[in-house]
Amino acid sequence: MLEKRYLVLEDGSYYEGYRLGSDDLSIGEIVFNTAMTGYQETISDPSYTGQIITFTYPLIGNYGINRDDFESLTPKLNGVVVKEASTHPSNFRHQKTLHETLAQYHIPGISGVDTRSITRKIRNYGVLRAGFTDNKDNIQELVEQLKTAELPRDEVQTVSTKTPYVSTGSDLSVVLLDFGKKQNIVRELNLRGCNVTVVPYDTSAEEILGMSPDGVMLSNGPGDPDEVDVALDMIRGILGKIPFFGICLGHQLFALSQGATSFKMKFGHRGANHPVKDLRTGKIDITSQNHGYSIDCDSLKNTDLEVTHIALNDGTVEGLRHKELPAFSVQYHPEARPGPSDSNYLFDEFIAMMKDFKEKERQINA
């Protein structure tokens, strides 16, 4: 017999469903993701650290979970909400069910709830604190706890690598600042022959330049960019000295380092179907996104940055480029996983930028 579980929101509403995953109940910021596939990559994305994900697609877990498709070593999210969780996956690669995987990583979840209603609530009122209980009598107590709960801060410290390591390639050398990177960023660089050195988020500009890389990338990651101000001096210290490419949180930190400001979005962009327009070409890409903060377009007016991409759904900033220096960034995920590969070409642009910069340096020193 399925055991009851309750998803409780800070506004006092609650949803009755069935126990999924761990009995280690937790609270977090509840968000929604609109991707139809890729639930495993989503669950293992470090950018969701401390959050509770509501999947809008009604059936999750139907092809199971396998270790090879994880985007990080250990999922760090605080909960999963689904309409229906598959108990009999059908895929020759699957190793565990969704329930077994969540239990293994001490992640609570709930199934059998109206995910459309939850999504509409988040859409209309913004992200909310939420938590789980297995006892209906504890709901009001949990509501009061949620109203005053301090959600985790500085999540980047939790998910960043503690020591540098190398993913070997044969050509250009790239230093990747790990703010909570997805593994597919490393894969995409390796596929293009890059030797990737992954370093902690608080590595200094001097340390990076001492490695003599051909380029620097700033990864995605969780939380508020204003809480990662340790990276701003590092960015300013390397700009112009080596080519630069920022993704998601890395994009936001790039903007902040040049004097722009960020703001918390009502419910963010999370899914694999977000249209983005390249203002340089007029081309529209369907992109994978996962962010709850955005750069204030007006704050860019007195900076050396220009907007290169915008979101078609709400007009927010999705891409930036420095007007003088070899540096650019995007708010979305060109590495996908999950999502379409429309924007893979941005890795090729970064490779071309590094080669061009290297050739100019060679000519200057000749």
Curated annotation (Swiss-Prot):
UniProt function note: Small subunit of the glutamine-dependent carbamoyl phosphate synthetase (CPSase). CPSase catalyzes the formation of carbamoyl phosphate from the ammonia moiety of glutamine, carbonate, and phosphate donated by ATP, constituting the first step of 2 biosynthetic pathways, one leading to arginine and/or urea and the other to pyrimidine nucleotides. The small subunit (glutamine amidotransferase) binds and cleaves glutamine to supply the large subunit with the substrate ammonia.
Disulfide bonds: none
Active-site residues (renumbered): C248 (nucleophile), H333, E335
Coiled-coil region(s): none
Uppermost EC category: ligase
Protein name: Carbamoyl phosphate synthase small chain
Cross-referenced InterPro entries: Anth_synth/Amidotransfase, CarbamoylP_synth_ssu, CarbamoylP_synth_ssu_N, CarbP_synth_ssu_N_sf, Class_I_gatase-like, CPSase_GATase1, GATASE
Protein family: Belongs to the CarA family.
Gene Ontology MF terms: ATP binding; carbamoyl-phosphate synthase (glutamine-hydrolyzing) activity; glutaminase activity
Binding site for L-glutamine: S47, G221, G223, L249, Q252, N290, G292, Y293
Region (CPSase): 1-171
Pathway: Amino-acid biosynthesis; L-arginine biosynthesis; carbamoyl phosphate from bicarbonate: step 1/1; Pyrimidine metabolism; UMP biosynthesis via de novo pathway; (S)-dihydroorotate from bicarbonate: step 1/3
Annotated catalysed reactions: hydrogencarbonate + L-glutamine + 2 ATP + H2O = carbamoyl phosphate + L-glutamate + 2 ADP + phosphate + 2 H(+)
Organism in which the protein naturally occurs: Staphylococcus epidermidis (strain ATCC 12228 / FDA PCI 1200)
SUPFAM superfamilies membership: Carbamoyl phosphate synthetase, small subunit N-terminal domain, Class I glutamine amidotransferase-like
Assembly behavior: Composed of two chains; the small (or glutamine) chain promotes the hydrolysis of glutamine to ammonia, which is used by the large (or ammonia) chain to synthesize carbamoyl phosphate. Tetramer of heterodimers (alpha,beta)4.
Residue span(s) of domain Glutamine amidotransferase type-1: 173-360
Enzyme Commission identifier(s): 6.3.5.5
GO biological process, one term: 'de novo' pyrimidine nucleobase biosynthetic process
Keywords, sorted A to Z: Amino-acid biosynthesis, Arginine biosynthesis, ATP-binding, Glutamine amidotransferase, Ligase, Nucleotide-binding, Pyrimidine biosynthesis
Domain of life according to the entry: Bacteria
Family matches, as PROSITE patterns: GATASE_TYPE_1
